Every structure is written in structure tokens, then in C-alpha cells.
Amino acid sequence: MGRFGYAFQNYDATRHVRSSVREKDMSHKHAREVAVAIKGLSIEKARDYLQAVVNKDRAVAFRRYKNQVGHKADPGMMSGRYPQKTAREFIKVLDNLESNAEYKGMDLDRLKIVNATVHKGVIVKRFIPRAMGRATPKNNVLTHVELVAQEI
């Protein structure tokens, strides 16, 4: 895998800590909604929220990709889902972010997520053979996730 850059601009190594994961097999639409949900939270609150999503105690509000998505009973939420696979991957990125902050000597209680970016990655193209010599495409879009936290 080659070198990559970060989408976050104005990165200051003394104030910010960042972590990323590349080409993970998760829905980029779910990842976008989870990223919006955890932006602005502390690392501990984000981890608790994502663990509640995995346990199906709290839902993630779907604001952009909400067609045919049912309503949830969480306060202040219309459409929502429980993207468990995506939440598990985000917990791993948060763990990496926390270890990077410890390595830099930052105070973990004062860290706040200031940027959560999601990009589409490589498309893994496959096909399903059908009758009469036809084929149906079955594409899998991989996802890049970047998190940046800052000491507040």
C-alpha cells in the first residue's frame, strides 16, 4: 500500500492527533452518518455511543441517506439505524487515536474529535452468473476513515 495524505487541513502536530484506516469493508453511507454523529464528542463519549449502537441501545440518525429508513424512538431523531459493523470499525479507529494521543503525551480527558472524514475507496468488482449467459455485477465499495482530535 502506498503513502497517503489526510484530508484535514491546518494540522498542527502539537495540538492535534489523528488516526485513519484505509480500505475497510464497510458501507460508506453508514460510515458517513456515524462520522457526523461522533464529531464534536470526546473520545470516551464517542466510544460509549458506538458501543451502545453495537448493542442496539442507541440509533444513528440518518440525515442524508434516509430513503426507506424507519423512524426510531431516540429523542430528536427521525430516521435512523444501527450500523453495527461500521460502529465496530470506528471503535478500532478510536482506540488507535487514543494510543496515538498517549504516545504524544496528550491529556485523554481533554481530547475532542474535531474532524471525522469518510471517503469511498477501491471498488472490488465481482459478478454473479445468471441464466442465458448473462451476468449481474456485484460491486463492493471499500471505505477510508480519518479521525482528528484536538486538546480543548
From Swiss-Prot:
User: rRNA-binding as a keyword?
Assistant: yes
Q: Name one Pfam family in it.
A: Ribosomal_L22
* GO terms of biological process kind: cytoplasmic translation
The UniProt function text for this chain reads: This protein binds specifically to 23S rRNA. It makes multiple contacts with different domains of the 23S rRNA in the assembled 50S subunit and ribosome.
Instruction: State the gene name recorded for this protein.
Output: rpl22
Q: Please identify the protein, giving its name as recorded.
A: Large ribosomal subunit protein uL22
Any one annotated GO CC term: cytosolic large ribosomal subunit
Q: Which organism is it from?
A: Nitrosopumilus maritimus (strain SCM1)
Q: How does it assemble?
A: Part of the 50S ribosomal subunit.
Any one GO molecular function term: rRNA binding
Please give the family membership noted in the entry: Belongs to the universal ribosomal protein uL22 family.
Q: Which UniProt keywords apply?
A: Ribonucleoprotein, Ribosomal protein, RNA-binding, rRNA-binding
